[in-house]
Amino acid sequence: RKQLIPFGLYEVRGFISANLAAETGFDQEDLRILFEAIHNMYEHDHSASKGEMSVVSPLILFRHVGTDTDERQRIRQAKLGCAPAHKLFELVKVAKKPGVEVPRSYRDYDAAIDLKHIPEGVEVGFQTYAGIAWGKLPEDENWFHEA
């Protein structure tokens, strides 16, 4: 007999090293293809054991841009990172909604991001199926909201 977990919500965190990207030639087109692959990774992979899995939009992106007025120094800052990753991830909160005992949908969760506390030198973007919206939540996405 197959075991079945009727519903699960997974949070996935990924990182791209600016230094390694420069060494390997990883560029904006590679990034676009990666985001497209993430959005579609379950569309052609349904099975009896996994049921129906999907990626819920938007992907939340943090981009280090630096703060210095000197362009060379700003690029250096951006490559090193302007804030620790764990501090950026702490800005995103996902919690089961009050009154929901057994969640059966991602809509049974409240998802929020604290846009007021994005560190200086960091930009936040939201990758939807339509593209990336930088600095604000996309109007066509209603699951995430500003904390």
List each language-model region with its residue ranges.
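Basic polyanion-binding and macromolecular-assembly surfaces
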Residues: 1-147
